[in-house]
């Protein structure tokens, strides 16, 4: 049984899903970028409680590759701060390297119920 404090933390938890779509001709460069730059950026994020960096498998993707970064924050305010500051920095770095070719989709997730 989860403690009351832990349950409150899960209710306040705020999640952000970032999906990066890379065209087929840039997959090798993107994979290298993930290993050399993106992983380091994510490791150094101050307000991110936990994260999962994943390759997305889907029958819907026929060209290119999708990568997802799922970020967990303590609360909505920390997520908003991330979007206003860190997300802009990450986006600018990716655009400097790949231009408009790598598309970034952000999705805010607000847990209603969970079972961790």
What are these regions (language model features)?
Residues 6, 10, 50-65, 92-116:
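Glycine-rich beta-strand-turn "strand-cap" elements at beta-sheet edges
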Residues 6-13, 42-45:
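Short, surface-exposed loop and linker segments with low hydrophobicity and enrichment for Pro/Ser/Thr
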Residues 14-21, 54-86:
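Short, well-ordered beta-strand segments in beta-rich or mixed alpha/beta enzyme
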Residues 24-26, 75-77, 113:
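Residues that cap or initiate secondary-structure elements
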Residues 26-53, 89-92:
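Short amphipathic alpha-helical segments
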Residues 44-49, 72-106:
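An amphipathic, aromatic/His-enriched active-site/gating alpha helix that lines ligand/cofactor pockets
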């Amino acid at each position: 049984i989860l403690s009351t404090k832990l349950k409150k933390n899960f209710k306040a938890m705020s999640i952000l899903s970032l999906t990066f779509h890379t065209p087929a001709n840039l997959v090798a460069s993107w994979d290298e970028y993930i290993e050399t730059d993106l992983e380091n950026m994510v490791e150094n994020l101050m307000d991110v409680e936990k994260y999962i960096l994943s390759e997305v498998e889907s029958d819907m993707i026929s060209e290119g590759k999708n990568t997802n970064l799922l970020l967990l924050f303590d609360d909505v305010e920390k997520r908003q701060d991330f979007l206003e500051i860190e997300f802009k920095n990450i986006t600018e770095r990716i655009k400097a390297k790949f231009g408009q070719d790598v598309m970034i989709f952000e999705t805010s997730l607000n847990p209603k119920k969970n079972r961790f």
